Amino acid sequence: MRHRSGLRKLNRTSSHRQAMFRNMANSLLRHEVIKTTLPKAKELRRVVEPLITLGKKPSLSNRRLAFNRMRDREMVVKLFDVLGPRFAERNGGYLRILKFGFRDGDNAPLALIELLDRPDEGEEGANVSEAAAA
């Protein structure tokens, strides 16, 4: 039976996959928008959304859980001090995934993954749409 086997392996070992998603999660929380392939973006959503939910409840145990998953003190501080209050009224759905064309070398589908409710979202959204049109 194929029940509960929904994890994408992405042609990597489990340790490589874990390290890759840890790095991608840190990059997404640092820059609030990143460009990657579509399957990686969809799988990254499963990693980052629970982290933001942890950030909404600032307790010592939640900070330790977040640090255990991210391994970056600076991003844990941002998660609990900036992103947690920003998404306090939102019940899930903290990310947006936009298809972004295809990569030149191997024609892999690309995607932009970004946090919602960014302070400069209006300006960045215009730049992203111009880049997508080009």
From Swiss-Prot:
It comes from the Bacteria. InterPro entries: Ribosomal_bL17, Ribosomal_bL17_CS, Ribosomal_bL17_sf. GO terms for cellular component: cytosolic large ribosomal subunit. Disulfide bonds: none annotated. GO terms for molecular function: structural constituent of ribosome. Gene3D superfamilies: Ribosomal protein L17. Keywords: Ribonucleoprotein, Ribosomal protein. GO terms for biological process: translation. HAMAP family: Ribosomal_bL17. Part of the 50S ribosomal subunit. Contacts protein L32. NCBIfam families: L17. Belongs to the bacterial ribosomal protein bL17 family. This is Large ribosomal subunit protein bL17. It comes from Aromatoleum aromaticum (strain DSM 19018 / LMG 30748 / EbN1) (Azoarcus sp. (strain EbN1)). The gene is rplQ.
